């Protein structure tokens, strides 16, 4: 395997591609935006026909990724920490229903409100 020097968000995106995702869904919000942008322009993602989609909000992004997982496909959903609050309803319900194909939720917190209107530790959702 070829070694590449990647930024953190690029490594997350490349790991998802290498892990066999069939789709990535996101709502733009720094610092999570760059994960989806990397997948959108990655030649390997295009060759593998990975579905790449921006959603109208975090809830619909999560629901679309969850639907892909219910269909037996692997998916990735990306959002910033305040977006997880928007997606909380389907997120908490999916903890009960489970997933089938695999679902990775990439939530980017902003310590010290670096790029957000508030500070939140999303690990409390765990």
Locate the predicted segments by residue:
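Thiamine diphosphate
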Residues: 1-126
């Amino acid at each position: 395997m070829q070694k590449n020097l990647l930024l953190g968000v690029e490594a997350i995106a490349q790991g998802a591609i290498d892990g066999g995702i069939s789709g990535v869904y996101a709502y733009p919000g720094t610092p999570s935006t760059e994960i989806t942008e990397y997948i959108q322009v990655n030649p390997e993602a295009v060759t593998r026909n990975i579905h790449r989609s921006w959603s109208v909000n975090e809830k619909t992004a999560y629901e679309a990724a969850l639907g892909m997982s219910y269909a037996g496909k692997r998916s990735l959903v990306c959002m910033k920490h305040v977006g997880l609050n928007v997606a909380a309803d389907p997120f908490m319900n999916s903890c009960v229903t489970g997933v089938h194909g695999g679902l990775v939720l990439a939530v980017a917190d902003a310590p010290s409100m670096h790029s957000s209107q508030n500070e939140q530790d999303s690990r409390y959702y765990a």
